[in-house]
């Protein structure tokens, strides 16, 4: 009796352990810890604009021959770059500049109806704009435009230097949204 119980238990154990069907494991991602926000004045003085810049961002001036006022802000530890472009405008060309910006935003999204827009207004400084947040697996989840409606138009687009995965990049996107709003 004892021996048959041992054989039955051993047989059941062998059946449970000898399973040959592969069970896939979920893919793991590294935890991304953005640094604490800290800001300084833009260290480039010959631009037609100024703003506060994260201490973690590196300013890259484009090669000679690119339009004046264009800069890139690189976050090497986050593998992200913010491409910024500047255009002198007139009140007559403001509408066209805004429409081009919106068209570029829509082109980046698979689902244009999911684009969220947040308006920005600082009447004391005469600065107005929009922040566009793209849902899903977009390579450029944040884009923005700023203008004084008279002579300056500034546009920025954030790009990841990796395959976008909105869930795993969400902490970085939140951090950079805070930097852009600052």
Give the label of every model feature segment:
Residues 1-19:
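Sec-dependent bacterial lipoprotein signal peptides
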Residues 16, 105-107, 177-179:
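Short, intrinsically disordered/low-complexity patches at protein termini
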Residues 19-80, 92-95, 100, 114-115, ...:
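N-terminal targeting sequences that direct proteins away from the cytosol to non-cytosolic compartments
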Residues 40, 85-88:
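Terminal, regulation- and interaction-focused segments at domain boundaries
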Residues 82-84, 142-143:
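Broad, structure-driven detector of short, well-ordered beta-strand segments within folded domains
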Residues 85, 157-159:
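Residue-level recognition of well-ordered beta-strand positions that form the cores
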Residues 87, 131, 178-181:
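A general structural signal for short secondary-structure boundary/capping elements
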Residues 102-155:
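Signature of long, low-cysteine stretches enriched in small and polar/charged residues
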């Amino acid at each position: 009796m004892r021996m048959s119980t041992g054989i039955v238990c051993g047989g059941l154990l062998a059946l449970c352990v000898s399973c040959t069907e592969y069970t896939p494991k979920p893919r793991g991602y590294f935890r991304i810890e953005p640094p604490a926000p800290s800001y300084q004045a833009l260290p480039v003085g010959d631009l037609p604009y100024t703003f506060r810049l994260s201490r973690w961002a590196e300013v890259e001036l484009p090669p000679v021959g690119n339009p004046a006022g264009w800069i890139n802000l690189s976050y090497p530890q986050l593998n992200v770059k913010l491409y910024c472009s500047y255009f002198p405008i007139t009140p007559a060309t403001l509408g066209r500049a805004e429409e081009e910006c919106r068209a570029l935003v829509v082109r980046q999204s698979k689902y244009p109806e999911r684009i969220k827009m947040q308006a920005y207004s600082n009447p004391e400084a005469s600065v107005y704009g929009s922040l566009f947040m793209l849902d899903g697996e977009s390579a450029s989840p944040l884009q923005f435009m700023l203008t004084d409606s008279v002579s300056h138009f500034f546009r920025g687009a954030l790009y990841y230097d990796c395959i976008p995965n909105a869930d795993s990049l969400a902490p970085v996107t939140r951090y950079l949204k805070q930097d852009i709003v600052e």
